[in-house]
Curated annotation (Swiss-Prot):
<dbReference type="GO" id="GO:0030435">
    <property type="term" value="P:sporulation resulting in formation of a cellular spore"/>
</dbReference>
<dbReference type="InterPro" id="IPR036390">
    <property type="entry name" value="WH_DNA-bd_sf"/>
</dbReference>
<dbReference type="GO" id="GO:0003677">
    <property type="term" value="F:DNA binding"/>
</dbReference>
<protein>
    <recommendedName>
        <fullName>HTH-type transcriptional regulator Hpr</fullName>
    </recommendedName>
</protein>
<keyword id="KW-0749">Sporulation</keyword>
<dbReference type="InterPro" id="IPR023187">
    <property type="entry name" value="Tscrpt_reg_MarR-type_CS"/>
</dbReference>
<comment type="function">
    <text>Negative regulator of protease production and sporulation.</text>
</comment>
<keyword id="KW-0238">DNA-binding</keyword>
<dbReference type="Pfam" id="PF01047">
    <property type="entry name" value="MarR"/>
</dbReference>
<keyword id="KW-0678">Repressor</keyword>
<dbReference type="InterPro" id="IPR039422">
    <property type="entry name" value="MarR/SlyA-like"/>
</dbReference>
<dbReference type="GO" id="GO:0003700">
    <property type="term" value="F:DNA-binding transcription factor activity"/>
</dbReference>
<feature type="DNA-binding region" description="H-T-H motif">
    <location>
        <begin position="62"/>
        <end position="85"/>
    </location>
</feature>
<dbReference type="InterPro" id="IPR036388">
    <property type="entry name" value="WH-like_DNA-bd_sf"/>
</dbReference>
<keyword id="KW-0805">Transcription regulation</keyword>
<comment type="subunit">
    <text>Homodimer.</text>
</comment>
<dbReference type="GO" id="GO:0006950">
    <property type="term" value="P:response to stress"/>
</dbReference>
């Protein structure tokens, strides 16, 4: 049986088709799992992500939240404002930078984030469950290096540096900062 040689345009189209279909299918499950996880806390995905980013960065500018949360600046601002209205974070300006707006988690915001982390149930997470056979076969979960390389090219080194830092934080931060209840609860989950 002869195979047609794919020309660059066809190859690009086929590759793009695969990325679109696979990422859309994956995101549908990720989104459903994430919504179900945080629903009891009266949060949406953007709000939860803002709490997480603000915690991970020890406070952040709206621009940083937009960048690392992969959302428009107005989305980051509007959802941060809703969180401020609920008393979960505060807005401020820095003396050295009056142009940017910064957010910081309040103790209530830290507490709610901790509650969400403690409520995470891997057995209710579709992507996690679907990955278990790979973990059992290879002894570890997929590293996602191809996807990470693509995201690095799209969003830059600083995005991936924050991604690496927050990933490292989940596994190692409790050793350095055992007083951090959010990280401690992740290690126990």
């Amino acid at each position: 049986m002869e195979h047609e040689k794919l020309y660059p345009g066809q190859e690009a189209l086929l590759y793009s088709h695969k990325i679109v279909q696979l990422s859309k299918a994956l995101w549908k499950t990720v989104e459903k799992d994430w919504q179900n996880w945080i629903k009891p806390f009266d949060l949406n995905i953007n709000e939860h992500h803002i709490l997480w980013i603000s915690h991970a960065l020890g406070g952040a500018s709206i621009s940083e939240i937009a960048k690392y949360g992969v959302m428009h600046v107005s989305t980051a601002f509007n959802f941060s404002k809703k969180l401020e209205d609920r008393g979960l974070l505060t807005f401020s300006k820095k003396e050295t930078d009056k142009r940017n707006t910064y957010v910081q988690l309040t103790p209530e915001g830290e507490s709610l984030l901790l509650e969400t982390i403690q409520a995470f149930r891997p057995e209710e997470n579709g992507v996690f469950r679907a990955s278990l056979p790979l973990q059992e076969l290879y002894g570890k979960f997929p590293e996602l290096t191809d996807i990470s390389a693509i995201v690095r090219r799209l969003y830059g080194d600083s995005f991936m540096d924050i991604f690496a830092e927050t990933s490292k934080m989940i596994t190692e931060e409790a050793d350095r900062r055992p007083q951090d209840p959010v990280i401690d609860s992740i290690k126990k989950a």
